[in-house]
Every structure is written in structure tokens, then in C-alpha cells.
């Protein structure tokens, strides 16, 4: 729900309410609001590729690592980067040594869940965009299907109940400004 709710902060109807000058209380001027909204998608493709790199590295390190062979961490990371990365890191980079998400904190082979949560959040929010950002019927359905069940129901089942269909990548791509460059997900 937190990533879903972040969408409201970007709405033109909401952003002026939560942004103001710290001394005067004056709302952020319209031209600044427009620039702030325009910055939302800046480098979003690069950011998405980076998150996919992290997720693929996480999957591969947990699926392929064989302690009898010795250290393969840098080899696997290099292969992943060769496949996905846009910018090569400097030779002294030791990202794998500090990527604690995949070795602690319960995210082992689960880093992809960050991006998957974004997919679900963007798609759920698109239901509101379709009906009106503050549509009470959609809000009630979201409350009943998602919030009220919490962790007592499989997240995908709850999502499908809310949207009446499986998740789609399109809303996240649109929200990220990536759909406008002619990519398709089919």
C-alpha cells in the first residue's frame, strides 16, 4: 500500500496541499509543480534497468552459486551487467560486497519483490485513474480487496480480485514515461 499511496503525492490536486514554503506557507507555484512532476520520469529507464540488474543478480547468485567451485560472485555479476547494464561501473567497484539486501534481512532471492510491488502499485492506481482519482466505489473496492485482507490472503489473488484481471506492466511503464518511447510488452 505504501507505494500505491505515493501516487497521490504526485497528483496536481494533492501536490499543492503537501508542498509549501517553510517560512511563508505559500504553496509551490504552478510552474514549479509542473517541473517537479516532469522530473518524476527523469532517468526512469536507467533506474528500472538497474533494479532489474539487482534482481537478476540476486536470482542467479542464489540459483547458481556452488561453493565447491569457489567464488563466482563477480563472474555472475559481470554476466548480468553485460546483459542488462547501460553504464559499466569502474573496475574498483565492489557492489556485490555491500549488496546486503540479498544476504540478510529476508530478501534472499526476493529482491525482485521491490519491482513487483511497483508493478502492482502502478496497476492498482490505474484503477483510480480510470474511474477518477478519488472515486469512492473504487476506494471501497481497494479497501475491501487489498487493505482489509492484508497478509491473510495471497497478494496476487487479492490484486486479481481488485482489478478483475492479472497485473499488467503497462501502467508502470506509462507512469515511468517509458511507454512513450515505443516499447511494447507483448
Which role fits each region the language model picked out?
Residues 1-186:
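Cation-handling catalytic/transport regions enriched in His/Asp/Glu
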Amino acid at each position: 500500500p505504501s507505494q500505491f499511496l505515493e501516487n497521490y503525492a504526485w497528483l496536481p490536486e494533492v501536490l499543492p496541499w503537501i508542498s509549501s514554503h517553510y517560512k511563508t506557507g505559500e504553496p509551490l507555484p504552478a510552474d514549479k509543480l509542473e517541473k517537479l512532476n516532469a522530473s518524476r520520469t527523469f532517468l526512469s529507464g536507467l533506474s528500472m534497468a538497474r533494479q532489474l540488474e539487482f534482481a537478476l543478480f540476486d536470482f542467479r547468485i542464489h540459483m547458481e552459486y556452488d561453493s565447491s567451485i569457489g567464488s563466482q560472485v563477480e563472474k555472475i555479476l559481470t554476466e548480468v551487467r553485460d546483459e542488462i547494464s547501460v553504464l559499466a561501473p569502474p573496475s574498483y567497484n565492489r557492489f556485490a560486497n555491500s549488496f546486503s539486501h540479498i544476504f540478510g534481512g529476508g530478501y534472499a532471492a526476493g529482491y525482485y519483490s521491490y519491482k513487483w510491488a511497483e508493478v502492482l502499485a502502478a496497476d492498482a492506481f490505474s484503477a483510480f485513474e480510470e474511474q477518477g482519482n478519488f472515486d469512492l466505489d473504487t476506494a471501497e473496492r481497494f479497501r475491501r480487496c487489498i487493505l482489509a485482507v492484508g497478509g491473510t490472503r495471497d497478494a496476487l489473488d487479492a490484486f486479481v480480485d481488485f482489478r478483475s484481471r492479472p497485473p499488467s506492466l503497462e501502467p508502470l511503464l506509462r507512469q515511468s514515461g517509458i511507454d512513450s518511447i515505443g516499447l511494447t510488452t507483448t
